[in-house]
Amino acid sequence: MIEAMTKSPETLTEVHGAISPKVLFEELRRGVLGQDRALRFASVAIHKHLLGKVSGNILLIGSSGTGKTTIMNNIQRLYDTVPGFENFRAVTILNANLLVDSDRTEFRPDRMFSAIEQRARVILGERPSLAALKETMERATVCVDEVDKMSTVIAGKPNPIGVVLQQGLLTLMEGERVPYRLHAFDGEKDREQTVEIDTRKMMFVCGGAFEGLYDQVYNRVSRSGSGERIKTEAVKTADGG
């Protein structure tokens, strides 16, 4: 359950531009219970994102009900709540399968950009300029849920759709200029233009259950002669056993 933030937004506004990961962490944990370690990583990534540095993309791994989507929603709540963060409010949460055309086995980044564009227009209001729309989109935070469902291998066989998704998503996360058509006001009337959306300043938060990952790690570190120094006992207790 996500709880409303109770700290005054003005507290953050006063230090905007140099807001520390510690302050961000305290704000995020007001809406997420029992996930402090994940929130610390998220706080550092958001801090870099706000300062315009290369964002630290995040992969959230955990079974259903552990709070992955809650963390994504709470990141969006942080941007929506704090005055002064308007330029970073283009946050979109989508399912991984929406990024692939299964019929054509084709990666569809335009679907992601469309969701970001819709959010950016809400933020900027009626008839935004092309420059403002492009800049807001390039500062977006993209949350992709259930990335594990698009595995490259299913039942021991290659999954072309999963391969296409992973390659396409990794390309965007590493930084890519992608052509995208935008309708924007040029001072006289609305025009449609093709612009290049630069993903280098976007922050990506991906989440998935990754069922079977624990067994793979356990088998690796407990295998005789594996060369791994992690103790088997430590792996056993990691799952509460």
For the regions a protein language model found, what residue spans apply to each?
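Short loop/turn elements that form and flank the Walker-type P-loop nucleotide-binding site
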Residues: 53-56, 86-89, 130, 135-140, ...
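Canonical AAA+ ATPase core
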Residues: 61, 70-83, 119-129, 148-241
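Short glycine-rich substrate-engagement loop in P-loop NTPases that contacts/grips substrate
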Residues: 92-137, 180-185
